[in-house]
Amino acid sequence: MIIGVSGIQGDFREHKWMIEKLGHESYVVRTPEDLEKVDGLIIPGGESTTMIRIMKRIGLFEKLKEKILNGLPVYGTCAGLIVLAKEIENYPQESLGVIDIKVMRNAYGRQVDSFDEMVEIKGFNKPFKAIFIRAPRVDGWGPEVDVLSTLDNHPIMLRQKNVLVTSFHPELTDDTRVHEYFIKMVEEYRK
């Protein structure tokens, strides 16, 4: 099983290391053809408008959307959440629209406002240290979206079928449980 990490822009190396720490092969995805080599894909934190612009320029945007709609498991953190979201409230930009959520970019402040918080996640036996860096806030979600964790009454981890998103950065911790959760999603997809 190979877990892809989008290497277009952002903190992809940290996700790659996390996947390898769990004993799985990782692959940095930079072209539409690379999608054929992976069983699941992580879209990291970074700058969502830059990611989308580059994805469109190299032909990855439409190919990725097609693969996700056909069942490819995908996990987006922070900017990756924005890239996957159906609607961005405070900034007009295109997105893949594959998870029925409405988000506000940078809702938790600027870089200097970064923080971490111990949060409860559905199915986890103890709290998880969630790190928020210029994080988006989810302000609305559809009936098919499962809220897995919240902070101050706003979802911070959600899943809709084969799409998982977090507004925080689990790859910046030593705790592998969120990545393990995604790997289980990929294993289910491969069956």
UniProtKB/Swiss-Prot annotation:
Ribonucleoprotein is among the record's keywords: no
InterPro entries for the chain: Class_I_gatase-like, PdxT/SNO, PdxT/SNO_CS
Record's signal peptide: none
Catalyzed reactions: aldehydo-D-ribose 5-phosphate + D-glyceraldehyde 3-phosphate + L-glutamine = pyridoxal 5'-phosphate + L-glutamate + phosphate + 3 H2O + H(+); L-glutamine + H2O = L-glutamate + NH4(+)
CDD domains in alphabetical order: GATase1_PB
Pathway where this protein functions: Cofactor biosynthesis; pyridoxal 5'-phosphate biosynthesis
GO cellular component: cytosol; glutaminase complex
Enzyme Commission (EC) number: 4.3.3.6, 3.5.1.2
Keyword annotations: Glutamine amidotransferase, Hydrolase, Lyase, Pyridoxal phosphate
Pfam family, any one: SNO
Function noted in UniProt: Catalyzes the hydrolysis of glutamine to glutamate and ammonia as part of the biosynthesis of pyridoxal 5'-phosphate. The resulting ammonia molecule is channeled to the active site of PdxS.
NCBIfam families: PLP_synth_Pdx2
Protein name (record): Pyridoxal 5'-phosphate synthase subunit PdxT
Naturally occurring in which organism (per UniProt): Fervidobacterium nodosum (strain ATCC 35602 / DSM 5306 / Rt17-B1)
Gene that this sequence comes from: pdxT
